UniProtKB/Swiss-Prot annotation:
The active site is at E178, E187. Pfam families: Methyltransf_25, PRMT_C. The lineage of its organism: Eukaryota, Viridiplantae, Streptophyta, Embryophyta, Tracheophyta. This is Protein arginine N-methyltransferase 1. Its main location: nucleus. Keywords: Methyltransferase, Nucleus, S-adenosyl-L-methionine, Transferase.
Length: 387
C-alpha cells in the first residue's frame, strides 16, 4: 500500500453529492440523515454511486504481525490524524449526542478505544458505564484522559486484546467502534468487533455503526500513473521494470479529485455488522462501470460508506471522492492497460477480496475486467496486495 508524496490527510475539500444507497451525506456538523426504510429498499438496486484475532503471522523471533499492529497505535501521530479528521470524529459525536436514547443508562463497550474519545462522548450522553478496550500503550494515556476529565466513575479502560480479556459484566447494551481501515477492511479489525458482538452483546443490543458498504468507480490519472508506475522504465538511464510489476500490485491510498471520475459509482458490497459473520468479509462481486464521457481510464478507485441506522434518523458518512475528504482517502488500483473509453461504453468484471493467509490484517485483491469498446478491446486479470 502506498500514498502519494505530499498528499494531505486534512478534511478540506468541497462538499458534493455522494451516491451510495441514495443516502444524503452531509457536512460533518449535520451528518447524513434519511428515512432508513426507504434507504434500505434502494440498496439492492443501487449502481450509483484496534485489536486482532488469532492466526497472526510470526515476524522475527518474538513479535507477531499483531504486535507490530498494536505498536503502530501507540504513537500519538496516528491518533492526532484520526481526531483531526472532522468527518470521522464529528460524525461519531453527532450520532452519540443526537441519539442519547441509545446510550442513556446503558452499558457500552468501546472496541479499540484509542484515546477514549468515543467513550467520553458516550459517557457525556448518559451511559451508565463504558468499558473501553485498547491493546496498545495508548490505553495508559486513555486512563489519564478519562481521569482528567472527571469520568473515572463511568469509564473503565481495559488494556488488552478483546479476545483475551474478560469484562466485569456478562453483557453490554451497545458496542461502538471505529474499526474501518483503508479499503474498509484493511487491518481486519472488523473480526474483533464481531467477536465482541457474539460474546457480549445482549439480545436487542446495538452495534454502531451497523452498516458499511464498499464502492467502485474508474478514473483518469495519467500524470500520477506516469510518475508512480512508468517511472521504473528508465531510472537515470537504467531499466528497473522488474520493480514496475510490484508497484502495480500495491494499491495507492490518496485523495482523488472528483473531476477525475469517468464512470458511475458502483455498489460492490453491503455489510450488516449486526448480523454478518467473519467469513462475509471475503467475497467475490461483479461490477459494471458505465462511462459518462469520452476519456482514458488508468485506474479503478474503491471507497466506503458507513451508516448508523438505529438513530432517530439515519446518519453516516462517505469516504468517496465526491464527499469531504477523510484520513481514509480512497484506494486507487492502477490498471496495466490504459483504457480508451467512449460515453456509454461499459467496463465489466469482478473483484475478489480475501484476507492474506499469512497475515489476516492484510488484504489480497483479485480484479478481473473487460472492455469491448469502439476504440479499445481488453480483458485482463490483476492481483493487488494491501500491506
Amino acid at each position: 500500500m502506498d500514498q502519494r508524496k505530499g498528499s494531505g490527510s486534512d478534511a478540506n475539500g468541497g462538499l458534493a453529492e455522494a451516491t451510495a444507497s441514495r443516502l444524503r451525506f452531509e457536512d460533518p456538523d449535520e451528518v447524513m440523515e434519511e428515512n432508513p426504510a426507504a434507504a434500505a429498499a434502494t440498496v439492492g438496486a443501487e449502481e450509483e454511486g484496534g485489536e486482532g484475532g488469532g492466526g497472526e503471522e510470526v515476524i522475527g523471533s518474538d513479535k507477531t504481525s499483531a504486535d507490530y499492529y498494536f505498536d503502530s497505535y501507540s504513537h500519538f501521530g496516528i491518533h492526532e490524524e484520526m481526531l483531526k479528521d472532522v468527518v470521522r470524529t464529528k460524525s461519531y459525536q453527532n450520532v452519540i449526542t443526537q441519539n442519547s436514547f441509545l446510550f442513556k443508562d446503558k452499558i457500552v463497550l468501546d472496541v479499540g478505544a484509542g484515546t477514549g474519545i468515543l467513550s467520553l462522548f458516550c459517557a457525556k450522553a448518559g451511559a451508565k458505564h463504558v468499558y473501553a478496550i485498547e491493546c496498545s500503550q495508548m490505553a495508559d494515556m486513555a486512563k489519564e484522559i478519562v481521569k482528567t476529565n472527571g469520568y473515572s466513575n463511568v469509564i473503565t479502560v481495559i488494556k488488552g486484546k478483546v479476545e483475551e480479556i474478560e469484562l466485569p459484566v456478562p453483557k453490554v447494551d451497545v458496542i461502538i467502534s471505529e474499526w474501518m481501515g483503508y479499503f474498509l477492511l484493511f487491518e481486519n479489525m472488523l473480526n474483533t468487533v464481531l467477536y465482541a458482538r457474539d460474546k457480549w452483546l445482549a439480545d436487542g443490543g446495538v452495534v454502531l455503526p451497523d452498516k458499511a458498504s464498499l464502492h467502485l468507480t474508474a478514473i483518469e490519472d495519467a500524470e500520477y500513473k506516469e510518475d508512480k508506475i512508468e517511472f521504473w522504465n528508465n531510472v537515470y538511464g537504467f531499466d528497473m521494470r522488474c520493480i514496475k510489476k510490484q508497484a502495480m500490485m500495491e494499491p495507492l491510498v490518496d485523495t482523488v479529485d472528483a473531476n477525475q471520475i469517468v464512470t458511475n459509482c458502483q455498489l460492490l458490497k453491503t455489510m450488516d455488522i449486526s448480523k454478518m459473520t467473519p467469513g462475509d468479509a471475503s467475497f467475490t462481486v461483479p461490477f459494471k462501470l458505465v462511462a459518462e464521457r469520452n476519456d482514458y481510464i488508468h485506474a479503478l478507485v474503491a471507497y466506503f460508506n458507513v451508516s448508523f441506522t438505529k438513530c432517530h434518523k439515519m446518519m453516516g458518512f462517505s469516504t468517496g471522492p465526491r464527499s469531504k475528504a477523510t484520513h481514509w482517502k480512497q484506494t486507487v488500483l492502477y490498471l496495466e492497460d490504459v483504457l480508451t473509453i467512449c460515453e456509454g461504453e461499459t467496463i465489466t468484471g469482478s473483484m475478489t477480496v480475501t484476507p492474506n493467509k499469512k497475515n489476516p490484517r492484510d488484504i489480497d485483491i483479485k480484479l478481473c475486467y473487460a472492455l469491448s469498446g469502439h476504440r479499445c478491446q481488453v480483458s485482463r486479470t490483476q492481483h493487488y496486495k494491501m500491506r
